[in-house]
């Protein structure tokens, strides 16, 4: 939500009630029958975790995921706490002007609310790579990590895009919020990967170009298509 606008509750967002600015989240097809990008689906999962854990979502994620991985400069708190704002990048529009009022507030924390750094996001990537090998399972077991990286409908696993070849698979994801665009790509078996974050609308094109250059210079597998 833009700065200065009323912030809806999670239930209001799910039901599409004012002051939410999105349609209600509704089942469109039987689960598993087809794939569709769904921030609403992650919002349902956010409410589910709150209901089951009886904790605030940001605290649950800090204790269950961020802290065990070592992502000390990351949080799902929305809006960003005052004491952390001095270290946050200013978001910019595509025309080079700052986003009015600063960063938006995203009560849809699971889908859009993570504040992080490239280094912390790289720790997330490395944890997946190491967890898959059984070297570090701070959050997921080897079997759960393998399940996370299996494709279902389309080319998505559980939260990540899966690409590459059977010999050298990789996982990737982009991220776009108002004034922030980012990309990550990492190979499951070789330990290679990169995270590029930008603070401008349209920055994902730059992030993807930087990752392609890294892939080419360092000779990643499938570097022509990464």
Task: State what each model feature region is.
Residues 108-109, 179-181, 202-205:
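A short local loop/turn or secondary-structure capping micro-motif enriched for an aromatic residue
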Residues 173, 182-200:
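Short, well-ordered beta-strand elements
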Residues 48-49, 195-196, 214:
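Hydrophobic aliphatic residue packing
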Residues 54, 170, 194, 205-206:
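Short acidic, gly/pro-rich beta-turn/loop elements at beta-sheet edges
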Residues 1-178:
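Short, surface-exposed loop or secondary-structure junction motifs
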Residues 166, 198-226:
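Short, gly/Ser/Thr-rich active-site loops of penicillin-recognizing serine hydrolases
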Residues 160, 180, 192, 217:
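Solvent-exposed loop/linker segments at secondary-structure transitions
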């Amino acid at each position: 939500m833009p700065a200065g606008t009323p912030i809806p509750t999670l239930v209001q967002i799910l039901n599409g009630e004012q002051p939410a600015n999105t349609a209600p989240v509704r089942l469109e097809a039987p689960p598993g029958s087809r794939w569709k990008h769904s921030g609403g689906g992650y919002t349902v999962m956010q409410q589910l975790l709150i209901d089951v854990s009886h904790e605030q979502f940001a605290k649950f994620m800090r204790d269950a995921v961020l802290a065990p991985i070592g992502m000390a400069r990351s949080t799902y708190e929305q809006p960003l706490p005052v004491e952390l704002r001095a270290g946050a990048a200013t978001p910019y529009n595509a025309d080079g002007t700052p986003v009015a009022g600063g960063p938006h507030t995203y009560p849809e924390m699971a889908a859009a609310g993570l504040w992080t750094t490239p280094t912390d996001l790289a720790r997330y990537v490395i944890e997946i790579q190491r967890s898959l090998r059984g070297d570090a399972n701070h959050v997921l077991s080897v079997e759960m990590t393998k399940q996370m990286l299996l494709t279902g409908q389309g080319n998505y696993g559980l939260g990540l895009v899966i690409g590459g070849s059977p010999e050298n698979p990789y996982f990737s994801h982009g991220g776009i919020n108002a004034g922030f665009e980012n990309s990550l790509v990492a190979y499951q078996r070789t330990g290679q990967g990169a995270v590029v974050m930008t603070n401008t609308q349209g920055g994902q094109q730059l992030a993807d170009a930087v990752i392609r250059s890294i892939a080419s210079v360092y000779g990643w597998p499938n570097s022509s298509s990464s």
